[in-house]
Amino acid sequence: MERNFTNMIPLAPLAILGKNKNTRNSLGGSLLQSLAFLLFTLLFSLSFLAGNSAYASNIAGPGVKSLSSQKELRAVWFSYLDWMNMPKEEQAFRAEAAKVMDNLQKNGFQTLFLHVHSHSDSYGKKMTVFPYSKFMPGNGSFDPLEIMISEAKKKGISVHAWFNPYRVSSSMSKWENIPEDSIVKKWSRTSGEERNVLLHEGQYYINPSRAAGREALLASIKELLDNYAVDGIHFDDYFYPRVSLTEEGKRFDEPEYEEAKRQGETGSLTEYRRNQVSLLLKQVHSLCKERGVLFGVSPVPNLQSLRSSVAYFLDVDKIMASKDYVDYIMPQMYHGFRAKNGKGQEAPHAYMRSLGDWVNLTNSTGNQVELMLGLGLYRAGSAVWDGNPVSEWFTESDILKRQVEEARKTGIVKGYAVFAYQNLLEERAQRELGNLRSVFQN
């Protein structure tokens, strides 16, 4: 219902103005009275709007929460592997969930990217489009997702629901172990729908080129937003699998492309595939905007890889130049400052080179999409190969701290996320984490 401000102005101050005997019958008094009334009305209106945020947001127009007006985002990815490490009994789970939030706060984080859909499954008991995930503790005796969100809200921690959009199977979730009543299994044995799910190099994927796959993903996101109080939806880099120049690679969704050409499609196969991903992103973003939550994606950091014709097919230049696809993009900047390729040269994904590429892209596309960075806490204290005789991750303990400092110098990076929660607890990561915590206090 439309609010009537005139009827909401308190009467007592107006009565006082009207009874002011010193000014009532003089021109000066009349002017002062009018000015006082106008000043009061203005102050009241401003205080009313400030105290009624829901109405104030409606005045600004419908849409998602603004990233620009928020403080620096500091998030942690909580993956299906982290879910597997949680207690199986409800009370113990609830206690551990509270501890998770304490660990986030202690280390300067205020946002959780919580896995809710990793292998065409669902992590919430109130979700039905995809089957309940085997990775969730409790065997269905309670709702771990609901508890995690509840414990997060108690501590003022935002939760973004993390989806892997197309992946169906992996070494951790084999096809033969997927429930027979799963929508992907039903597709595979239903005439006319069997191409909704595709086998490629030993693993299964939802076909990005089929409307049924997009509709199922959208329905799953919608039911999550209907039933769980999350603040955002988050996709990572699992878009198209790598399709080589082999016949199998060409065939992945080539039949859909050929049908599209018969219907008037004029673009190349690469352009067609990019458009399929863009279509899904646009539909998800529209849903999120309608619900007032954020939507972002976290692709690989190498722009050359994203622009290739053999993998991902995320049209990064297109989505960065528009407000219609995502609210933020968070490249997975997991490599260090001295990363090298096999020839001993600076790698395209070396941190400063990659940071410069993303800053340039963000600026050249008019800053339509907020830029954030994913950081590789999981590498801290390890001898992970980075092209050097001895990995910088093994010899140094302030890499993430310096990465944040360099990103802040750009003036456009709006936040960070570290992968992953389990690494917050590892002894080898504590010095790196302590240094990161110190820069988060600034």
Spell out what each predicted region is.
Residues 81-91, 129-141, 200-215, 266-276, ...:
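The substrate-binding groove and active-site-proximal loops of carbohydrate-active enzymes
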Residues 89-106, 133-153, 216, 275-282:
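Aromatic- and glycine-enriched glycan-recognition loops and surfaces
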Residues 95-120, 228:
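Catalytic domains of carbohydrate-active enzymes, especially glycoside hydrolases
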Residues 125-136, 167-199, 238-262, 388-392:
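Aromatic- and acidic-residue-enriched segments that line the glycan-binding/catalytic groove
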Residues 188-303, 307-325, 332-335:
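Polysaccharide-binding and catalytic clefts of secreted carbohydrate-active enzymes
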Residues 325-344, 369-442:
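Substrate-binding cleft of secreted/luminal carbohydrate-active enzymes
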